[in-house]
């Protein structure tokens, strides 16, 4: 499982150094290839390549006659790129994806089970503050019987 939050700095070339705790797991379980894509304007998704393939298949299976779904396919699949982790555990994030999501220097790498989300660190702090301010009664209604 991929979990935890790491605040990292991109180097001057736009490379992200995957933290050692994740690098070892990724290399042993999934190999050195990752797939990065855009899901929204505020963050990127970063999948180990084997975890991306079923997501890609589900996206390709969506009905293409629906204009909204077609736009979503175009957004996610059209921006998907395979990255190779170098010997130092770094991946080069495509410049266009960095621009679209305002990833410049400080970023938050957020483990989400089968993938990472990659946020501008300031935006991540804002998202975290918003999450902490969620109305607990409203959240309980949505969670039903689920507890931690």
UniProtKB/Swiss-Prot annotation:
What keywords are annotated for this sequence in UniProt?
Cytoplasm, DNA-binding, Repeat, Transcription, Transcription regulation
Q: Which CDD domains match?
A: MraZ_C, MraZ_N
Q: Does the keyword Transport apply?
A: no
GO terms of biological process kind: negative regulation of DNA-templated transcription initiation
A Gene Ontology cellular-component term: cytoplasm
PROSITE patterns to which the protein is assigned, alphabetical: SPOVT_ABRB (PS51740)
Q: Which GO terms describe its molecular function?
A: DNA-binding transcription factor activity; transcription cis-regulatory region binding
Q: Which residues form the SpoVT-AbrB domain?
A: 5-51, 80-123
Signal peptide positions (record): none
Q: Where in the cell is it found?
A: Cytoplasm, Nucleoid
Family indicated by similarity: Belongs to the MraZ family.
Subunit info here reads: Forms oligomers.
What is the designated name of this protein? Transcriptional regulator MraZ
